[in-house]
Amino acid sequence: MRVLCCGDRNWTSYEIIRKELEKFPKYTEIIQGCANGADKILANIAKSIGIKLISSKDNDDIINNSGFPADWKKYGRAAGPIRNKQMLDEGKPDLVLAFHTDIEKSRGTKNMVEQSKKRGIKVVLIKE
């Protein structure tokens, strides 16, 4: 199973993310965007509990930055939505977990949720 995880850059609850990731079997693969907050927390937790992180074919730093980092220098403000599309295209998730307390105030996580729903991918919103 492939699970795309995204979330708030201001997310701080390690416990909530750990609880969610521990629900999945060890053969689960996690797709994430390398952003501060929820993404970095969940990447660290996934590594610590033995869940594989999937990296972008363009990511040449898979040891330190396993995932799909946005190229802000190349794409500017469009980098986030471009990265979100790339995570969906390359990662091919079965499920999306969105860690956000107020999705209506979000730009990045909200964009990922919208793109996922348009593709018919189940989205679970988890609040802090």
What are these regions (language model features)?
Residues M1-S13:
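Glycine-rich phosphate-binding "P-loop"
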Residues N10-E128:
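Acidic/glycine-enriched connector segments
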